[in-house]
Amino acid sequence: MKSVFVRRFLIAAAILFIWFIIHTTVVIIDGLNDELKPVDAAVVLGNKVETNGQPADRLKARLDRSVELYKENYYRFIIVSGGIGKEGFDEAEVMKAYLVDKGIPEDNIIEDNNGYNSYMTAQNTSKIMKDLNLNSVMIITQYFHISRTKLAFSKMDIKDVYSAHAKIFDFRDIYSIIREFPAYYKYLLK
């Protein structure tokens, strides 16, 4: 009896592990294959702001990627989405200031100050798109985060969603990639 239970447990664990490997491979490939198409707006998802009020490296990489593609005329508007982090800074305000310093016209930057997670960013972006009659967006975030973010946007009935990943890789990505597995299915079941 005990060996049957152990064998079933090991089979289930092996299936889950294989599923994780396949899912993670698909997420990484999807995230690293940018879908660059002219769109109405980019959506830059927030991330940590340092205690000195400057964007952390991951957030800088996202913002720099948005500037690069803006200057290549991929979109007119940049939606910066974030909340107030534990450091006490409004991510969207910090992001906007960074973009203005990089030469993006202030009128072309739209703040979403309630993007506390990817799902809320998708909800808020959907409303912004309706209000401004925008039809297409390009998500800009870390490569491992793109599949789940596209899922959230599709749940908000946003059809034309493309993506570009921030050009930064670090050791913490291992944790983030592992975290994306349960997070993706949490969003799928929302």
Where are these regions (language model features)?
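Enrichment for repetitive, rod-forming helical segments
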Residues: 14-15, 69, 186
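Short, Lys/Arg-enriched, disordered terminal segments
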Residues: 1-10, 74, 101, 189-190
